[in-house]
Amino acid sequence: MTRRPSVLFVCAKNGGKSQMAAGLMRQLAGDRVDVHSAGTKPGTAVNALSAESLGELGIDISDQTPKPVDPQLVADVDVVVILGREAQLDPVPGTEFQNWDTDEPSERGIDGIERMRLVRDDIAARVRRLADQLSTPSSTPSEEPVQ
């Protein structure tokens, strides 16, 4: 039996981007990929606009709770994806790290649900590419690996 690939999505608070990425991957890959999310400085709740923007796609993350990064999980997963510029993790031998410098519409004056939809769509495109890479046994995920 082949082991399922696994991914850990990390952002600072584990209330927005990493939760969105995990929700999108769960919907896209189903049980073909083990999906986890965590934060380097976890907040107390999922961002309401993040949940609303995924809800528009039929994905419910409102019951998720922010959790801290577990060093053992970082070592155990195949890929760690760091979303945004705030979260920092030291690379672990044997685990692939990817940095996703996600779109930040607020830098262009776009806020509220419109901002979150743009963030969601950027993350969704990246999640689709990662899901494709994880489902191809001979390929290795390779978007912006950390050296």
Regions found by a protein language model. Give the residues of each.
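Alpha-helix C-terminal capping/helix-to-coil transition sites in glycosyltransferase folds
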Residues: 74-76
